[in-house]
Structures are given as structure tokens and as C-alpha cells.
UniProtKB/Swiss-Prot annotation:
PANTHER family: ATP SYNTHASE SUBUNIT B, ATP SYNTHASE SUBUNIT B', CHLOROPLASTIC. The keyword Transport applies. Keywords: ATP synthesis, Cell inner membrane, Cell membrane, CF(0), Hydrogen ion transport, Ion transport, Membrane, Transmembrane, Transmembrane helix, Transport. It is a single-pass membrane protein. SUPFAM superfamilies: F1F0 ATP synthase subunit B, membrane domain. GO terms for cellular component: plasma membrane; proton-transporting ATP synthase complex. It is found in: Cell inner membrane. This is ATP synthase subunit b. F(1)F(0) ATP synthase produces ATP from ADP in the presence of a proton or sodium gradient. F-type ATPases consist of two structural domains, F(1) containing the extramembraneous catalytic core and F(0) containing the membrane proton channel, linked together by a central stalk and a peripheral stalk. During catalysis, ATP synthesis in the catalytic domain of F(1) is coupled via a rotary mechanism of the central stalk subunits to proton translocation. Component of the F(0) channel, it forms part of the peripheral stalk, linking F(1) to F(0). The chain crosses the membrane at residues 7-29. Belongs to the ATPase B chain family. F-type ATPases have 2 components, F(1) - the catalytic core - and F(0) - the membrane proton channel. F(1) has five subunits: alpha(3), beta(3), gamma(1), delta(1), epsilon(1). F(0) has three main subunits: a(1), b(2) and c(10-14). The alpha and beta chains form an alternating ring which encloses part of the gamma chain. F(1) is attached to F(0) by a central stalk formed by the gamma and epsilon chains, while a peripheral stalk is formed by the delta and b chains.
């Protein structure tokens, strides 16, 4: 019977140990496991939320970059258009100024040509009178000279 009493003693000790473990040891272990599961689940949920937020932020950033690129292209196009307008205005002003300068040049050349032509007429008339005086051998009076010069200038 010794064997049976030992077996019963061991059964009672095991039952007490099991009851003690279930009552005092098992709840803190289960609580720690549940807390760990909860913290892991929360961490996974936070990671998923952060991944979702990162994806949303990335999408928003890409949209903003696209908008900025479009706006930059619009600004560049506007600047190019304005540059072309200014260039056209400057070219038109330059053409107008060029035409005005050429016209002034022609007017100055024409005035100079007329002045030189008039001087040439007077000199030709004076030379003609001088030649005529030498041929005739006498001097025509001053009033007659001026009269003859005026007539020659008018004829030329």
C-alpha cells in the first residue's frame, strides 16, 4: 500500500500544485500574453495606419508636385509669350526708327545735293563769265556780271 499512498499523496500534491498554478500563476501569465498580443495587434494596426498615411501623403505630394509642374510650365509659357511680345514690339520700334533714320539720311543727302548743285551753278557761271571776259578782253561791269550770273543760274 505504500505505493498507493504515495500515489495518492502525489496526486493530491499535483492537484494542489495545479490549483495553485491555475489560481495564482496562470492568470498573470495569461494576462501578460494577452497584453503582448494586444500590443502586437496595436503595433500592427499602427504600422498599417502609418503605411496608409504614408501612401496618402505620397499621393498628395505627387499631386502637389504635378500641380507645381503645371503651374511652372504655365509661368514659363507666359514668360515666353511676354518675351515674344516684347521682342515684336522692339523689332517694330527698331524698324520704325530705321525707316525714320533712312528717311532723314535721304533728306540730308538731298539737301546737300541741292546745296552743292547751287554752289556748282554759281561757280560755273563765275567761270563762264571769267572765260568770257578773257575772250572778250574786257571786264563787264559788276551789275551786268550779277545779272548774267543770275540768268545763267536760272538756265542751269
Amino acid at each position: 500500500m505504500n505505493l498507493n499512498a504515495t500515489l495518492i499523496g502525489q496526486l493530491i500534491a499535483f492537484a494542489l500544485f495545479t490549483w495553485f498554478c491555475v489560481k495564482f500563476v496562470w492568470p498573470p501569465i495569461i494576462k501578460a500574453i494577452e497584453e503582448r498580443q494586444s500590443s502586437i495587434a496595436n503595433a500592427l494596426a499602427s504600422a498599417e495606419a502609418a503605411r496608409k498615411e504614408q501612401a496618402d501623403t505620397k499621393t498628395l505630394a505627387e499631386e502637389e508636385i504635378t500641380k507645381a509642374k503645371i503651374q511652372a510650365q504655365e509661368i514659363i509659357d507666359s514668360a515666353n509669350k511676354r518675351r515674344n511680345e516684347v521682342l515684336d514690339e522692339v523689332k517694330a520700334e527698331a524698324e520704325t526708327l530705321k525707316a525714320k533714320i533712312i528717311e532723314q539720311g535721304y533728306a540730308e543727302v538731298e539737301a546737300e545735293r541741292k546745296r552743292v548743285q547751287e554752289e556748282l551753278r554759281v561757280k560755273v557761271a563765275s567761270l563762264a563769265i571769267a572765260g568770257a571776259e578773257k575772250i572778250v578782253g574786257r571786264t563787264v561791269d559788276e551789275a551786268a556780271n550779277n545779272d548774267i550770273i543770275d540768268k545763267l543760274v536760272a538756265e542751269l
